Design a protein with these regions (language model features):
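Amide-donor transfer/coupling interface in amidating biosynthetic enzymes
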Residues: 1-74, 89-95, 99, 126, ...
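Short, glycine/charged-enriched secondary-structure capping and boundary segments
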Residues: 53-55, 84, 117-120, 153-156, ...
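N-terminal beta-loop-helix "entrance" segment that forms/cooperates
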Residues: 73-86
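Helical hinge/lid and interdomain linker segments adjacent to catalytic or ligand-binding clefts
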Residues: 85, 89-92, 115
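Cysteine-nucleophile active-site neighborhood
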Residues: 100, 105-174
Length: 305
């Protein structure tokens, strides 16, 4: 799919090397169709890496998309050049009058804090409310999934005895749903988190549908409002080396770091990772864009409500 991206975004050149079709604004304006408007609220510390990971997956349909990036005003990133943030990101307050066909809200390295103690909790709560009548479908990832479930539905999170770290087999519980069209009976999802939401809390709420889980990592995917909200507790967007980089980073800090499970070939960290989630990750984003955005969003974007 041709993605319409801001001129000079670093991800453009990175993805062109992977033979992924992206276009800048100059080329996109010559095509007489309405692109889908997608906004990414990127809360991850490594902004450029996350941008590239998500754009790689968004590129997997024939639809043109106009991708923009949102930031919270109440938090200043420490790991991304300020020039990059100024060039490619806008504060929520400057975007709140716009409407979008789709939105992705990423994870954040704050999961061990109480939600209300996060310094941008008030602002992100406002964004959660805003998305409900300004976006056709919103995808919440990892910490954002826990935060969205807590804010909208009162679902608590619980600390884990040890970090959920690795790639785990998932079961589709509602295979008839369009989000799983083309899926096998099982698929794999990377996880990297210290907290969880629990199955019994999801099942006790009639507004929520548990659509994928795992005996190892528990709740994986939850759907609400007929597909206008998806909550994914793992990281289908992760590149092949993300868990490896995280493992080596933590090993440099301390010795008592568990190796990511089901990740390295022969479970040997000296060998290359074995990617088992890429095909389903592409299919998941393709289905979300096609069935829950393109098929549902009004042509007149101002009619989203």
């Amino acid at each position: 799919m041709p993605l319409r991206l801001p001129d000079k975004l670093p991800a453009i050149e990175l993805l062109k090397r992977e033979n992924i079709f992206v276009m800048d604004n100059t080329r996109a304006t010559t095509q007489d169709i309405r692109p889908l408007k997608i906004v990414i609220l990127n809360l991850m510390p490594l902004k450029i890496t996350t941008e590239t990971d998500l754009i790689r997956l968004l590129s997997n349909t024939p639809l043109q998309m106009d991708v923009s990036f949102m930031k919270v005003k109440s938090h200043t990133p420490k790991n991304t050049p300020i020039e990059h943030m100024m060039m490619f990101y806008r504060d929520f307050e400057k975007m709140r009058d716009e409407k979008f066909d789709g939105m992705i809200i990423t994870g954040a390295p704050v999961e061990q804090m109480d939600f209300e103690d996060v310094n941008y909790w008030d602002e992100i709560s406002t964004i959660f409310d805003w998305a409900r009548n300004h976006v056709t479908s919103t995808l919440y990832i990892c910490w954002a999934a826990q935060a969205g479930l807590y804010y909208h539905y009162g679902i608590p999170k619980y600390p884990l005895e040890k970090k959920m770290f690795g790639v785990f087999r998932q079961h589709t519980l509602c295979p008839h749903l369009p989000i799983f069209r083309g899926f096998d009976d099982v698929f794999y999802m990377p996880h990297s988190r210290h907290t969880e939401v629990r199955k019994e809390d999801i099942l006790a709420n009639p507004e929520l549908t548990l659509i994928a889980d795992s005996p190892e990592n528990g709740v994986s995917m939850v759907m609400a409002r007929g597909g206008r909200e998806f909550f994914i507790t793992g990281h289908m967007e992760y590149a092949s080396n993300t868990l490896d980089n995280e493992y080596k980073r933590d090993k440099d800090i301390r010795d008592d770091v568990d190796m990511p499970v089901n990740y390295y070939r022969d479970n040997n960290p000296d060998k290359e990772p074995l990617v088992t989630w890429r095909a389903h990750a592409n299919l998941l984003y393709h289905n979300w864009i096609n069935y829950y955005i393109y098929q549902e969003t009004p042509y007149d974007i101002s009619q989203i409500k």
